[in-house]
């Protein structure tokens, strides 16, 4: 009674590793949780207070989202990109993941996914019956596709519609896309649109934020939400910015929304206004300072002749490749690490890499972000002593990984 395409799917890898880690902890085992990509920081206090004030909100809100919320999101995106966006171009959903799913179902064409890509892009394509294509990338290109590789794929059948999904900063690599302008030139030439997943865009470390919407806004759907920069993953609030040129897609998504989630939780939407309306720059600066310090600590202490990876540029991920490990699959390798060292990381296979490539995703978020943030100032230097004091599992997990690499 189950469709074959659904039978072959597994639980989302990120959620699955979180459940496995929790089950091991419930059995009394200490697990270093480098597998689940959840923000370690608390939701800003002002936003929490707004949720308390709006707990009484009980009515269904507009399918597209509360107008006042869409208004502040439009202002936020307009300021961020130095472009004019309107509330009518915003659609709010119960997490950007759900909106991506509705987009996959609405879109009549084929999906282009860089290797690596976030774990849910491909399964959503399968569920929606959209053919998908993987595009290989390299560490030298920050794990993003070149404009030439995208064009080469499109030219195999340039009469089809294509949707390219770009995620910068990237999950799982922690890298930032540097060739957006070159990619945009290809986008403008062919029947292709872009989903720009910008959920980590407030967490870029050393470079200025840039969106492909700055180069081809008429063909770019921007995706964002509260889960990463605002620490509100469990609140489930995301949004799309859809250009007027793609109104048909927006209207189709509204129809699907009306037949699925109806509207996002009313208290959450009212509270979210303050997330975009109030200045949270100190909160974001401290978040980035901590994440950058921790990411660079893990990078410098784990990198070796046997472990290669790019230095993190944003978000909270590293993508180490273990050159001296000879397992049949990266999944087997991660199971070995969990069994021997109680460190949970995700195999690169879940992100589109060949199963025999010993590459992984490491999420350096296993610490109490609220406590850490409360102990630092804007000018505090994040050193090993601070990390050891307020993020001990980061130190412990890195040492266990090094020991596993060197001895096993």
Question: Language-model segments: what does each one mean?
Answer:
Residues 2-94, 276-278, 385-389, 405-408:
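N-terminal small-domain helix-loop-helix segment of the aminotransferase-like
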Residues 24, 128, 186-190, 305, ...:
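Helix C-cap/helix->beta junction micro-motif
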Residues 106-125:
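Conserved PLP-anchoring active-site segment centered on the Schiff-base-forming lysine
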Residues 155, 336-344, 351-408:
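PLP-dependent enzyme catalytic core of the Aspartate aminotransferase-like
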Residues 273, 289-299, 309-322, 358:
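Conserved glycine-rich beta-strand-loop-beta hairpin in the small C-terminal domain of fold type I
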């Amino acid at each position: 009674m189950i469709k074959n395409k659904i039978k072959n799917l597994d639980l989302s890898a990120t959620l699955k590793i979180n459940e496995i880690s929790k089950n091991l902890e419930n059995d009394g085992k200490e697990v270093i949780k480098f597998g689940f990509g959840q923000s370690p920081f608390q939701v800003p206090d002002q936003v929490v207070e707004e949720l308390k004030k709006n707990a009484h909100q009980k009515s269904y809100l507009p399918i597209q989202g509360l107008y006042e919320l869409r208004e502040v999101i439009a202002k936020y995106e307009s300021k961020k990109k130095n472009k004019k966006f309107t509330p009518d171009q915003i659609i709010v959903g119960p997490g950007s993941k759900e909106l991506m799913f509705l987009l996959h179902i609405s879109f009549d064409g084929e999906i282009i996914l860089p290797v690596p890509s976030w774990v849910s892009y491909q399964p959503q394509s399968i569920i929606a019956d959209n053919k998908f294509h993987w595009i290989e990338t390299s560490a030298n290109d920050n794990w993003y596709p070149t404009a030439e590789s995208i064009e080469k794929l499109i030219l195999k059948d340039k009469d089809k519609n294509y949707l390219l999904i770009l995620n910068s900063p990237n999950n799982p690599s922690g890298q930032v896309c540097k060739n957006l302008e070159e990619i945009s030139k290809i986008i403008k030439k062919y029947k292709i649109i872009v989903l720009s997943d910008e959920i980590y865009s407030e967490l870029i470390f050393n470079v200025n934020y840039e969106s492909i919407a700055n180069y081809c806004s008429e063909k770019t759907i921007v995706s964002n939400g509260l889960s990463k920069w605002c620490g509100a993953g469990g609140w489930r609030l995301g949004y799309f910015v859809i250009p007027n040129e793609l109104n048909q897609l927006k209207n189709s998504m509204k129809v699907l929304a009306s037949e699925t989630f109806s509207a996002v939780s009313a208290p959450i939407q009212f509270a979210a206004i303050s997330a975009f309306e109030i200045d949270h720059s100190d909160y974001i600066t401290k978040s980035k300072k901590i994440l950058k310090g921790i990411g660079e600590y893990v990078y410098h202490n784990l990198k070796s002749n046997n472990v290669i990876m790019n230095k993190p540029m944003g978000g909270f991920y590293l993508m180490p490749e273990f050159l001296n490990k000879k397992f049949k699959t990266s999944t087997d390798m991660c199971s070995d690490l969990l069994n021997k060292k109680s460190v949970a990381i995700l195999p690169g296979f879940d992100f589109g890499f060949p199963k025999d490539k010993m590459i992984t995703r490491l999420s350096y978020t296993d610490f109490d972000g609220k406590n850490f943030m409360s102990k630092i100032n804007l000018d505090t230097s994040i050193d090993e002593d601070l990390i050891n004091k307020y993020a001990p599992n980061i130190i412990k997990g890195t040492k266990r990984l090094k020991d596993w690499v060197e001895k096993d």
